[in-house]
C-alpha cells in the first residue's frame, strides 16, 4: 500500500510530535462543513486525527503541514468555470483524483456540486477513511469513491473500478498529485486522465514543479525517484498525449519559498504549477 512508508521520510520536519499551531483560517472549511463553531474543539479534533494518521500512514509534506484542511481547488483559475458547469448540468461528472482526506470533495459539495456528480479517488482509501472522521460525515457522505492507482491501465479500463466512466468525465481535478510520481508514472497518469475524459473535457490541477525539470526525492515506496516537471516540459507532455489548449503556469506562493529551504535539496528551483488541458 503506497501509504505505508518503505523508507525513512525525506522531510526533515516530519518528525515533531505536535503539528504547527492551527489558525482560525485553517479551520474555515471544517467549521463550515461540520457546522461546529467552537474552533478550539475543532483544533483538538484535528490534532487527534493528525496523530492517528501520523502513527499509521506515510506523512506527505502537505499532511505534515496540515495543508489538507485548506481546500486547494478554489485556488485554481479554472474552478469557477467548472463549478458553474457542474451546478447547471447534473449530468456532468467530476473526478477528485488523489483526493487524500477529501477536502476538495467537501469544498465542491459546499459549493453546490451535486454529490452524484462527484467521484473521489486515490491510490489508497487510508487517508479518505480518516477524512470521514475528520469531516464527521461517515454516515452521510454520498459521493462515489474508488481506490487504485491512476497509473495502472486496469484501473480505468473496461471492467476496472473506473472503467464505467471511460470517455464520460467532464472535469478531472488533481490537486498536488503529479509531484509524488516518477516521470514514467506522470506520463501513465496523464494518459489515463485523457482516456477517462469526455471529448471537450478538462483536466485541471496543481503540482510542485521545478525549473529546470528533473528528478527529486524518492517515491513513498522507495522504488523510483519523483519527477518535477517545468511548465515547458509538462505542457509538451500533455500536448504529446493529445490534450489541446494546454496552459501551465508557475508561481511561487509563500509556502513554496519555505519548501525550497527545507525540502530535500535536489533538482532546480521549486515552483507551484497550475495546469489546464482540454481533450
Ligand atoms: C500530496 S497528496 C495531495 C492530496 C490532496 N489532493 C491535496 O490537495 O491535499 C498526493 C495524493 O495523491 C495520492 N496518490 C499518489 N499516487 C497516486 C496514484 N498513482 N494514483 C492516485 N492517487 C495517487 C496520494 O495517496 C495522496 O493522497
Task: Cite the ranges covered by each PLM segment.
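A short SAM/SAH-binding and catalytic strip from SAM-dependent methyltransferases
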Residues: 163, 167-185
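Class I (Rossmann-like) S-adenosyl-L-methionine-dependent methyltransferase catalytic domain
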Residues: 2-165, 184-186, 192, 201-279
Amino acid at each position: 500500500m503506497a501509504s505505508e512508508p518503505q523508507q525513512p521520510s525525506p522531510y526533515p520536519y516530519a518528525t515533531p510530535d505536535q503539528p504547527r499551531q492551527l489558525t482560525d483560517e485553517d479551520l474555515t472549511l471544517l467549521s463550515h462543513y461540520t457546522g461546529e463553531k467552537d474552533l478550539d474543539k475543532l483544533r483538538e479534533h484535528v490534532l487527534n486525527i493528525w496523530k492517528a494518521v501520523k502513527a499509521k500512514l506515510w506523512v506527505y509534506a502537505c499532511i505534515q503541514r496540515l495543508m489538507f484542511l485548506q481546500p486547494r481547488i478554489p485556488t485554481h483559475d479554472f474552478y469557477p468555470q467548472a463549478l458553474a458547469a457542474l451546478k447547471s448540468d447534473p449530468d456532468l461528472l467530476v473526478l477528485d483524483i488523489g483526493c487524500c482526506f477529501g477536502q476538495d470533495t467537501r469544498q465542491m459539495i459546499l459549493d453546490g456540486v451535486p454529490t452524484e456528480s462527484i467521484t473521489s479517488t486515490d491510490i489508497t482509501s487510508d487517508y479518505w477513511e480518516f477524512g470521514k472522521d475528520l469531516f464527521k460525515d461517515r454516515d452521510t457522505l454520498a459521493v462515489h469513491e474508488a481506490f487504485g492507482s491512476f497509473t495502472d491501465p486496469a484501473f480505468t479500463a473496461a471492467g476496472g473500478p473506473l472503467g464505467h466512466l471511460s470517455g464520460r468525465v467532464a472535469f478531472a481535478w488533481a490537486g498536488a498529485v503529479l509531484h509524488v510520481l516518477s516521470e514514467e508514472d506522470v506520463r501513465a497518469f496523464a494518459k489515463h486522465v485523457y482516456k477517462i475524459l469526455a471529448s471537450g473535457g478538462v483536466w485541471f490541477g496543481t503540482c510542485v514543479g521545478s525549473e529546470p525539470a528533473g528528478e527529486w526525492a524518492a517515491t513513498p515506496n522507495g522504488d523510483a525517484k519523483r519527477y518535477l516537471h517545468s511548465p515547458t516540459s509538462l505542457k509538451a507532455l500533455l500536448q504529446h498525449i493529445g490534450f489541446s489548449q494546454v496552459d501551465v503556469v508557475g508561481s511561487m506562493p509563500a509556502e513554496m519559498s519555505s519548501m525550497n529551504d527545507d525540502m530535500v535539496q535536489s533538482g532546480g528551483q521549486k515552483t507551484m504549477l497550475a495546469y489546464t488541458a482540454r481533450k
